[in-house]
Design a protein with these regions (language model features):
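Positively charged n-region of N-terminal signal peptides that target proteins for export
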Residues: 1-4
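Bacterial N-terminal signal peptides
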Residues: 7-16
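Expand to "…catalyze enediolate/carbanion chemistry for C-C bond making/breaking, isomerization
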Residues: 21-335
């Protein structure tokens, strides 16, 4: 104990000495050679400083975006889902519907899916729980993805700042909504995502990717927009054409829900084909449920939940031994 006290005292003394030295020799003041003169109007709105790329009066409509965040020459795609899509492969997202336990999430993320469809539209967990799951196994085989609840700045930026590499946005009904979702997904100049930090920038997540996260994420993010309503069907061509939309999801359940027709009926299939036609014309990837993996032109899928995966796994493991429990005549287990 006495030794620890002496060590602590020595550290304090060294700290005080360093502080005293700094006060005796203060650092030179920071220089701002292009700053406006104190208390004066610099006229910056009307005229740029010497050497500026953007000349003339300030106008956002004609602003030439700078090169500070360009990806380095020769940068390669590091998101395996984006790469597989670009190569023409089929990608599948396994759904984590209700789990908040990182161990369950990581088991799903290493089970063989391309990405994890973390469900936030129909689940009440918070973003803190999601961020904790994602940072537990960031280098799992399946990259973190999420279906957000709606297309707004707060929802999508929570997802991205936590490390999402696949963003699924539901119920896109118009070109304006498609652009809104795109804007919050991408950094400028394509979008309006704020550069505010978050665990996505950490070295334990994507901070160490080749070329830098801020510089390369626009080329690596996957944005999937869902058409689920009659209004969305009417605007399908315009939705699919929005730059930055990677794929369009034909929502098998809600297109039935909003149309009033069951899968297989002519009216239902017409709705699905409207999404198909718009997506193919736009040169985008077409997504649907895993049951449609053999349907023409569908190359992106949502698979079942972690609960369904557990049930399937147990059934496969037990085989003929499944559901062969003894049946007591009495007690709580009597049937």
């Amino acid at each position: 104990m006495k030794k620890l006290i002496l060590v602590a005292a020595a550290c304090i003394a060294l700290g005080m000495a360093a502080f005293a030295a700094q006060q005796a020799q203060p650092a030179a003041p920071t220089q701002f050679p292009l700053a406006a003169p104190a208390g004066q109007d610099s006229g910056a709105a009307a005229r740029p400083p010497a050497g500026a790329v953007n000349q003339g009066p300030f106008d956002p409509a004609t602003w030439k975006y700078g090169t500070a965040f360009n990806p380095p020459p020769g940068s390669k795609i590091w998101n395996p889902v984006k790469l597989k899509m670009m190569q023409g492969g089929k990608v599948t997202g396994g759904t984590v519907f209700s789990a908040t336990d990182p161990a369950t999430y990581c088991a799903m993320a290493n089970a063989g899916y391309d990405f994890i469809w973390t469900e936030m539209q129909h689940n009440d967990r918070d973003w803190q729980a999601v961020a904790r799951m994602w940072r537990t196994c960031p280098n799992a085989r399946a990259v973190p993805g999420v279906r957000v609840a709606y297309a707004d700045e707060r929802e999508i930026q929570h997802a991205l700042d936590a490390g999402a590499l696949v963003i699924v946005v539901p119920t896109i009904d118009s070109k304006a909504e498609a652009i809104e979702a795109r804007n919050w997904t991408y950094f400028p100049p394509l979008g309006r995502r704020s550069n505010g930090g978050g665990q996505a920038f950490d070295q334990g997540m994507w901070g160490g990717v080749p070329g830098g996260y801020r510089q390369t994420i626009n080329d690596n993010i996957v944005l999937i927009e869902m058409i689920e309503t009659l209004e969305g069907l009417k605007e399908a061509d315009e939705i699919a054409k929005v730059p930055g939309v990677t794929a369009v999801f034909a929502a098998s359940g809600d297109l039935g829900n909003f149309s009033g027709f069951a899968q297989g009926s002519p009216d239902y299939e017409r709705a699905i084909n409207i999404v198909h036609d718009a997506t193919i014309k736009a040169g985008k990837r077409l997504c649907g449920p895993i049951a449609w993996r053999d349907r023409a032109d569908f190359t992106c899928f949502q698979a079942g939940t972690e609960l369904a995966a557990i049930a399937r796994g147990v059934a496969a493991e037990l085989g003929p031994l499944a559901n062969t429990q003894a049946k007591p005549e009495v007690g709580p287990f009597a049937k």
